[in-house]
Amino acid sequence: METYYKAINWNEIEDAIDKSTWEKLTEQFWLDTRIPLSNDLDDWRKLSAEEKDLVGKVFGGLTLLDTMQSQTGVEAIRADVRTPHEEAVLNNIQFMESVHAKSYSSIFSTLNTKSEIEKIFEWTNSNEYLQTKAKIINDIYENGTPLQKKVASTYLETFLFYSGFFTPLYYLGNNKLANVAEIIKLIIRDESVHGTYIGYKFQLGFNELPEKEQESFREWMYDLLYQLYENEELYTKSLYDGVGWTEEVMTFLRYNANKALMNLGQDPLFPDSANDVNPIVMNGISTGTSNHDFFSQVGNGYLLGTVEAMQDDDYNYGL
């Protein structure tokens, strides 16, 4: 009989990067429910009203980007997979983007009141700079070429998130909100793999283009980055001018914009390097976690769940 549908065979790998990425992502699987966020409540109460407002807004913005990535971003690049294993990796990425988006709600429910949470989401869903970057990226997801979609995804994963990531990393470096920052470090660890992987898949397609097409496409890539950077500068000023961190955040953004370009196999655009970034924040960006140990309750990484033997009554569902 003619083959109607093919089973995926993980014993026949066409691209070793698919397998190594799958293994990396599954190895670092995590859930927000395993982080003891309530341990940060003492730190939270000591923050000023302005600082609390900043934290709420940056996490609102990050929630929006992760929501878009989980709903339309991964779907947009799924149609152009080269191997069935690539599609499996994208399934994993899509699920983890949903975990990331949910994690911010876990932070909100721990630190904020119901009315504060409502205000955060109201701000997020109406902020002009957030909505502008969402529109720029999502328009490409809906109307761009397969290569353009991969560029948009890599810019989002490796560049646009970082105006928000700066805040928790800064507090972590100052011994505040350590468990909130632990979630952010876990998210950064995921996004680092996502951006590298999708950038690699982009390079495979880009390198197949004739030289002239590469030149015009490269122009489009840098134009898009400039457009996003200009909007991100306005967004950053609106968030950080009040606490005086704007210039440091912009340096951090330029550094990560260069990383996004390098993931895509392109030359960096900005002069900023890791040495220019606030060392406290740079230290926090390392993709290890403070205590990624399922068998320990020491530190601020994963906590061991409480296990008890099953009883007969446990099987009386709804009785």
Where are these regions (language model features)?
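Non-heme di-metal
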Residues: M1-L319
